[in-house]
Amino acid sequence: MKKKIKYNRILLKISGEFLSSKKTFNINTIFITKLIKQIKLLTNLGVQIGLVIGGGNLFRGSDLEKIGMRRSISDKIGMLSTVMNGLLLHEFMQTANIKSKIFSSTLLEGICERYHIDKAIKCLEKKSVAIFCFGLGIPFFTTDSAACIYGTEIKANILLKATKVDGVYSSDPILNKSAILYKNLSYKDILRKELKVMDYTSLILAYENKLPILVFNMYDPEILYKIIIEKSNIGTLIK
C-alpha cells in the first residue's frame, strides 16, 4: 500500500557541525552517506526538498568575532563556509544520482547559481534538491534566519530543524537529565519560556509567516522518512 505523505515540500536545516569528524579530512562521511540515503528515499517518494546547511564545522562568525574580528567580516567568512558545505553535499548527491542545484544569495560565478525564487521553485518542481548557501548574504543574520526566509519563499509545508537531541526541552537535556521534552509549543511559548531553539529573529520570522517548525533528532537514520509518512510522537512541533 502506498504510504501517505504528510509534507510534499520541506525546508531542511542542518547544522554544519553534523558534517564534522576527527577522521577523513574532518568530514563525517558516515553521517553524510546516511543523510544522502534519506534524501534519496524522500525524493523517490516525490517530496520536494530545500536544504540549508550551516558552516559551524568550518567557521562560525560569532566565534571569529571573539578573537577581535569585525562581525561584518566574520559573518561573511561564516557564510562562505556554508558554500563549501553546500558544494560537498551537492557532490555527494551527484554521486548518488540525486538531482540537485546549489543556489547562493550572492553572486559566486562558476560556483553557485544566484538565488532567485522562481528558479528555486522550478528546481523543486523538477524534483531536484535546492541547496541554499551563503545565508541571506548580509551579516548579523543566522542560517536559521535564512532557513525561515527560504522556507517561506518556496512555500514549504514545514521547516525541519535537525538537532542532536529529540526536540525542545525545558533546559539542556545533556546537562539536566530531568529536563522535560515538549511535544507541542507555540512560537509565543518559546519566547515566554526563553527556550533555546533558535535565535529570536528566526523565530519571529517563522511566526509572522506562519511557518511551522519541527525540531528533531537527526541521528535516527530513518527520521526523515518517519516524519514524512506522519509517524506520530516525533520531535517538537512549533506553530
Curated annotation (Swiss-Prot):
Its EC number is 2.7.4.22. It is an enzyme of class 2 (transferase). ATP binds at K13, I14, S15, G16, G56, R60, T163, Y169, D172. It catalyses: UMP + ATP = UDP + ADP. Pathway: Pyrimidine metabolism; CTP biosynthesis via de novo pathway; UDP from UMP (UMPK route): step 1/1. GO terms for biological process: 'de novo' CTP biosynthetic process; UDP biosynthetic process. The keyword Isomerase does not apply. One of its GO terms (cellular component) is cytosol. InterPro entries: AceGlu_kinase-like_sf, Asp/Glu/Uridylate_kinase, Uridylate_kinase, Uridylate_kinase_bac. Belongs to the UMP kinase family. Homohexamer. This is Uridylate kinase.
